[in-house]
A protein has these predicted regions:
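Extracellular, cysteine-rich, disulfide-stabilized repeat modules with beta-strand cores
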Residues: 25-27
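Boundary at the C-terminal end of the N-terminal hydrophobic targeting segment
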Residues: 14-22
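An N-terminally biased module of ancient metal coordination in phosphate/nucleic-acid-related enzymes
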Residues: 32-120
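Acidic (Asp/Glu)-rich catalytic clusters
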Residues: 57-60, 85-91, 111-125, 146-156, ...
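H/E-rich (His + Asp/Glu) clusters that bind or coordinate divalent metals
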Residues: 234-377
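Active-site gating/metal-coordination segments in enzymes
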Residues: 42, 110-229
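Hydrophobic faces of well-ordered beta-strands that scaffold small-molecule active sites
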Residues: 64-70, 96-99, 125-130, 159-161, ...
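Acidic-and-aromatic substrate-binding clefts and catalytic sites of carbohydrate-active enzymes
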Residues: 73-81, 100-110, 134-142, 169, ...
Length: 377
């Protein structure tokens, strides 16, 4: 017999509102009901949509793209790996990959040498330089600037991807947390301005990762699958604190070009991202790993990309060739209600934002070329 319970009797009060008891759902105002059969787990419930709409599967980018958020890792260290990368990029119409693997010194020189030795890839891959933020204290800045100069001389075209560990976990020599806007780091950002190279920085993680892991958290499944992505407030600074430090750094260095990776983790709040871009003309942003937010608000995303078309770069993050076409489909079509490629990121569907060609060209390649002088033309 189906269990129908009165919300007046068994409701759970949440402030001025009420909610059905666990294991039930509201089927009519004031009535909660449990399923006939035991419900599946969130992992096993995979409903198939019956919606019939036009579908346009976009296998290659409409214009030759620059992936500014590449992580090819070991693929760029050998002739065989570069050949594998070559075939994958050609199949996607990705003209250039920027390796944002935070390498420096000998590792960077080895990567650049391998790339330059490849006739097929010497004009297809560029490398960003890493910064070692460990042991910040007296004398650190001078050494870091010297290493950065050497890395740029060796072929680096920018700095990055600066890891989220800056701000979250790295400690200074005195044991205190290294804040993103620490004055000790100013010489590095000033040197980037002098060299005319951009800084590609990943700050914090999605806001949800800093919230309680309960059944109201949109990223509950991801945080259960990857518990290391949780940032409880008793161990880490808050999301808001990290964003404040990041923005302070951006403001302090108006001559330095910064690229906020992952749309600054503001793709779920485009008004906040727009306010940041309005306030700081030296800041750009990049779309890697936030397609799930871009594609669930197609009208707002379309308008945002139109307004800030000169400030957005294309990037993918994790190098999985099969996932790039989802970006192309969102950016280039008006398709409705289609799957995202990682269910644990998002249990919702995506919509195309149908960007005009003039904007696609800027996002795919022109903006990256504008701010990164070392990229192949």
């Amino acid at each position: 017999m189906r269990a129908i319970v009165s919300i007046a009797l068994l409701s759970v009060r949440l402030g001025a509102q009420t909610a059905c008891p666990a294991g039930t759902t509201e089927v009519r105002p004031g009535n909660c009901e449990a399923p006939h059969d035991p419900p599946p787990s969130i992992l096993d419930y995979r409903p198939k949509s019956t919606l019939v709409t036009p579908a346009h599967f976009v296998k290659v980018a409409k214009y030759p793209a620059i992936d500014f958020h590449g992580h090819p890792d070991e693929l760029i260290m050998s002739e065989q790996g570069l050949e594998t990368l070559h075939k994958a990029l050609d199949g996607l119409n990705v003209r250039v990959m920027v390796a944002a693997d935070n390498v420096s010194g000998g590792e960077l020189r080895d990567a650049v040498a391998a790339i330059r030795a490849s006739s097929a890839m010497r004009d297809r891959v560029r490398v960003l330089a890493g910064i070692d933020f460990n042991d910040v204290g007296p004398g650190w800045a001078e050494r870091a600037v010297k290493q950065l100069d050497a890395d740029v001389a060796a072929g680096a075209v920018g700095v990055g991807e600066i890891s989220k560990s800056l701000g979250l976990s790295i400690r200074k020599r005195d044991g205190s947390r290294l804040k993103i806007d620490d004055p000790a780091l100013d010489p590095i950002w000033d040197e980037c301005a002098r060299l005319g190279i951009p800084v590609f920085i990943h700050t914090a993680d999605p806001w949800e990762f800093f919230q309680p892991v309960d059944y109201t958290n949109e990223r509950w499944l991801e945080l259960e699958l990857f518990p290391g992505r949780r940032y409880p407030k008793d161990r880490f600074p808050s999301f808001e604190e990290l964003m404040t430090e990041r923005d302070n750094m951006f403001r302090k260095h108006p001559r330095t070009t910064f690229i906020a990776a992952h749309m600054g983790w503001h793709a779920n709040d485009l008004a906040s991202l727009g306010a940041m871009l309005d306030a700081m003309p030296n800041v750009y942003t990049e779309v890697g790993a936030v397609l799930y937010d871009i594609g669930r608000q197609p009208r707002a995303s379309h308008d945002f990309f139109i307004k800030y078309q000169d400030r957005i770069l294309f990037g993918k993050d994790s190098f999985q060739p099969s996932e790039y076409p989802y970006y192309f489909r969102v950016f280039e079509t008006a398709d409705e209600y289609f799957d995202y490629y990682r269910p644990y990121h998002a249990f919702w569907k995506l919509y195309g934002i149908a960007l005009p060609d003039s904007v696609l060209k800027k996002v795919y390649f022109a903006n990256a070329l504008k701010i990164t002088q070392g990229l192949p033309r």
